[in-house]
């Protein structure tokens, strides 16, 4: 067994994903999810060596109790494995401009994450709860923070500054930050290996497609533009998020239709996207089923989703100058051969030609090139953010 194991924690507002990852291979020794925090039926599910387990956490429990269960029940039952854990790695959604790389957590870092909470009010406070719970449960282990925004700190000003009064950036930090950076970092690195090119000479466009979705232009291993902005709302059509729209729509909804700002925020984040257009579901699998059955709303939602994505991919050839490959990842990107084919068919001007057999084969965790031999390359690479977090954690504690 490797002596480079890391416990990776990803704390949401009402859930906690966890895994024990081998930083050398990326394999998970344990993985699980605690959910429904604050409710009567808080539960935890986990898998060890392929064997599934489930338990109640008790009514109205939360992150602290979940971490204690992981320590006292799950890891206590695997003492040999637990003894090999070298660090706890935390996924942090927003590091603002304060954090350009992963860091070992101390009080200064905790304060910095707190100061970025206004930029990610649903996520950063939950991450802080998880950090404090982990410190209490693992007082002797180093804790490491890995930021979703850090990868995008290499963007030039022309990509991240909004055309608003500059003082809003200077005084309040209002700018494009981007998300999914850990995923885009991983798949762009893996894409260079598939292409058999040095990372420094590889230009790819990565599409991380899930309930949240973003596109990033990666030039020589560095992010040079990305579709999400100050928050995860900007950019692509998503499961329940609207993505790009005319900002005056907000004014119209408030002053002409009587919405409150809170209602508009909720509408754009939780009632829009695939769900809002289809009036059916936010789940892409349900959208594809509706499309196959001829459901008008599902068909329109799918077409808009693919069209917006294709436009972004096309536009990101501008900062790259030369395109080596388009990479699909995330739950939708890895599994929807329908969406991949539709998007690439819209991009035939760039000489994309889908190989139907390869495209259908690249699903359920299988990676590979999905275009014909004479085509510009498009590929599927399953993301592994936990591996990046584990790798960064080991690198930092062994410096």
From Swiss-Prot:
Cofactor binding: number and manner: Mg(2+). Can also accept Mn(2+).
Subunit structure: Homodimer.
Residues that hold Mg(2+) according to the record: 10, 385
Site annotation Transition state stabilizer: residues: 180, 241
Gene, per the UniProt record: ackA
Function: Catalyzes the formation of acetyl phosphate from acetate and ATP. Can also catalyze the reverse reaction.
UniProt keyword terms in alphabetical order: ATP-binding, Cytoplasm, Kinase, Magnesium, Metal-binding, Nucleotide-binding, Transferase
Organism of origin: Shewanella sp. (strain ANA-3)
UniProt-recorded Gene Ontology molecular function terms: acetate kinase activity; ATP binding; magnesium ion binding
One annotated GO biological process: acetyl-CoA biosynthetic process
UniProt cross-references to Gene3D superfamilies, sorted A to Z: 3.30.420.40
Pfam families xref list: Acetate_kinase
Cofactor names: Mg(2+); Mn(2+)
NCBIfam families: ackA
Classification via PROSITE patterns: ACETATE_KINASE_1, ACETATE_KINASE_2
Compartments, record wording: Cytoplasm
Protein name, as recorded: Acetate kinase
Binding site for ATP: 17, 208-212, 283-285, 331-335
InterPro entries assigned: Ac/propionate_kinase, Aliphatic_acid_kin_short-chain, Aliphatic_acid_kinase_CS, ATPase_NBD
One GO cellular component term noted in the UniProt record for this chain: cytosol
Active site: 148 (proton donor/acceptor)
Family: Belongs to the acetokinase family.
CDD domains xrefs: ASKHA_NBD_AcK_PK
Highest taxon listed in the record's lineage: Bacteria
Pathway: Metabolic intermediate biosynthesis; acetyl-CoA biosynthesis; acetyl-CoA from acetate: step 1/2
């Amino acid at each position: 067994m490797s002596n480079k194991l890391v416990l990776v924690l990803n704390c949401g507002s009402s859930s906690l994903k966890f895994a024990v990852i081998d930083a050398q291979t990326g394999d998970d020794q344990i993985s699980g999810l605690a959910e429904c925090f604050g409710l009567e039926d808080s539960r935890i599910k986990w898998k060890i060596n392929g064997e599934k387990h489930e338990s109640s956490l008790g009514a109205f429990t939360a992150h602290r109790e979940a971490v204690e269960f992981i320590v006292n029940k799950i890891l206590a039952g695997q003492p040999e494995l637990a003894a090999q854990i070298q660090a706890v790695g935390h996924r942090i959604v927003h590091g603002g401009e304060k954090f350009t790389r992963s860091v070992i957590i101390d009080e200064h870092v905790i304060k910095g994450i707190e100061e970025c909470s206004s930029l990610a009010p649903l996520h950063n406070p939950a991450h802080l709860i998880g950090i404090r719970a982990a410190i209490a449960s693992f007082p002797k282990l180093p804790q490491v923070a890995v930021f979703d925004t850090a990868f995008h700190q290499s963007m030039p000003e022309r990509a991240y500054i909004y055309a608003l009064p500059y003082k809003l950036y200077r005084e309040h930090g209002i700018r494009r930050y981007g998300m999914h950076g850990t995923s885009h970092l991983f798949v762009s690195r893996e894409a260079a290996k598939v292409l058999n090119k040095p990372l420094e000479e590889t230009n790819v466009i990565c599409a991380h497609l899930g309930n949240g979705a973003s596109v990033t232009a990666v030039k020589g291993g560095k992010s040079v533009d990305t579709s999400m902005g100050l928050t995860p709302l900007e950019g692509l059509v998503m499961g329940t998020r609207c993505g790009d729209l005319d900002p005056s729509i907000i004014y119209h909804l408030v002053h002409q239709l009587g919405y409150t700002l809170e209602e508009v925020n909720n509408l754009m984040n939780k009632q829009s996207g695939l769900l809002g257009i289809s009036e059916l579901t936010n789940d892409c699998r349900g959208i594809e089923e509706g499309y196959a059955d001829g459901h008008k709303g599902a068909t329109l939602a799918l077409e808009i989703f693919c069209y917006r994505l294709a436009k972004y991919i096309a536009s990101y050839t501008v900062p790259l100058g030369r395109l080596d490959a388009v990479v699909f990842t995330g739950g939708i990107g890895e599994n929807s051969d329908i969406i991949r084919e539709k998007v690439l068919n819209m991009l035939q001007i760039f000489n994309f030609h889908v190989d139907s057999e390869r495209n259908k084969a690249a699903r359920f965790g299988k990676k590979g090139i999905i275009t014909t031999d004479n085509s510009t390359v498009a590929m599927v690479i399953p993301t592994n953010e936990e591996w990046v977090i584990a790798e960064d954690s080991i690198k930092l504690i062994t410096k």
